Amino acid sequence: IAEPGFPSSDFDGELQLLLQEMGKNPPYDVYLIPSGTQLFGMKGGNKEAMSFMETLDTTRAYNRSNVNFLPKQVKLFSDGAIYSQLMQMKDGYTDGHHGEWMTPLSLFEEQLMMYWNNDYKIHVHANGDLGQQMVIDLVQKAQNINPKQDHRLTLHHMGYFDKPMAEKMKNLGIGI
């Protein structure tokens, strides 16, 4: 089982609960990908979050035989969820409400560029076509500044997108 985006709110509490449950030796392993968004707030900044992440896969207190943090991977969050209708949509919503950015755009760009430039595999929660377009545009910018052949950036969830966006994702090497 993979949990991209760990923790959701309380690193120590969630980890202790997970380790306690996994101590019962269920017939599966758990692989964790840290949340750059949550750790930004918990650690007081992007550099502090990344420094903490650098210790996760090698610190025994955070790993067990069946629980492991994946090295050099991070989950970032673009726009809101499908079911809550908080995705960012290019054409908006018919009832006039607006989607939400889960991470302010300037912070998201700072995070994506920092992890990109430090050779992380980046996973991005993105649902609406505007949220995904923002990620596509930033990956293009990152490729222009610091080109990578096999960056393996991956979009998760993919609520709404069109064929031209899919082609652009393919051309940029974005996984879906």
Over which residues does each language-model region extend?
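Polar interaction faces of repeat-based domains
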Residues: Q133, D137-P147
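C-terminal active-site-proximal or functional interface alpha/beta core segments in diverse enzymes
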Residues: N144-I176
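Metal-coordinating catalytic core of metallo-dependent amide/deamination hydrolases
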Residues: S9-D129, Q133, A166-G175
